[in-house]
Amino acid sequence: MFCEKAIELIRELQRASDGQLPAFNEDGIRQILEEMKALYEQNQADVNEAKTEGRSDLIPTIKFRHCCLLRNRRCIVAYLYDRLLRIRALRWEYGSVLPSALRFHMSTEEMDWFNQYKRSLATYMRSLGGEEGLDITQDMKPPKSLYIEVRCLRDYGEFEIDDGTTILLKKNSQHFLPRWKCEQLIRQGVLEHVLS
């Protein structure tokens, strides 16, 4: 039956839950494209016959096949677009390096698209926030407070905050500092977040 394979392709995506990426169905796409080619060739033959022999009884069949072509095309585009949205979401969830199990489910073109998206996102983040850039993938949920209490794990020396205030970070001293200013030092092991 017409368009059956295209609808099955869409159902395959619907069966996969959000956040999952089913294996790229290259065989299904190829079968749909072959069906579209056959429908197009049949339409071309019938259009030529309708023109030369004046057979207007072929027009409904031609229109039906044309509608099937359009539906197949819409289904393929929807399949590919949904996969790209899922791949884009994976970049935000897993970072710039995908697990091999996910890469296995992607086509070569999808891997190329992912790598280009990754580079574009990195370029955009470097253009924000001055010299270091701004990692917009870091805090996917807004912090509960702008200031946090931290304990100094080792002697660091003077630390300047944006308002010009300098703080002496000595081992075991505790401070109430802006979260975004402390995150780098927490990652370096100079400070630790004190949870009350």
UniProtKB/Swiss-Prot annotation:
GO terms for cellular component: CMG complex; GINS complex. It is found in: Nucleus; Chromosome. The keyword Glycosyltransferase does not apply. Keywords: Chromosome, DNA replication, Nucleus. The keyword Nucleus applies. InterPro entries: GINS_A (IPR021151), GINS_bundle-like_dom_sf (IPR036224), GINS_Psf1 (IPR005339), PSF1_C (IPR056783). GO terms for molecular function: chromatin binding. It holds the Pfam family Sld5. One of its GO terms (biological process) is DNA replication. SUPFAM superfamilies: GINS helical bundle-like. Belongs to the GINS1/PSF1 family. Required for correct functioning of the GINS complex, a complex that plays an essential role in the initiation of DNA replication, and progression of DNA replication forks. GINS complex is a core component of CDC45-MCM-GINS (CMG) helicase, the molecular machine that unwinds template DNA during replication, and around which the replisome is built. Component of the GINS complex which is a heterotetramer of gins1/psf1, gins2/psf2, gins3/psf3 and gins4/sld5. Component of the CMG helicase complex, composed of the mcm2-7 complex, the GINS complex and cdc45. This is DNA replication complex GINS protein PSF1.
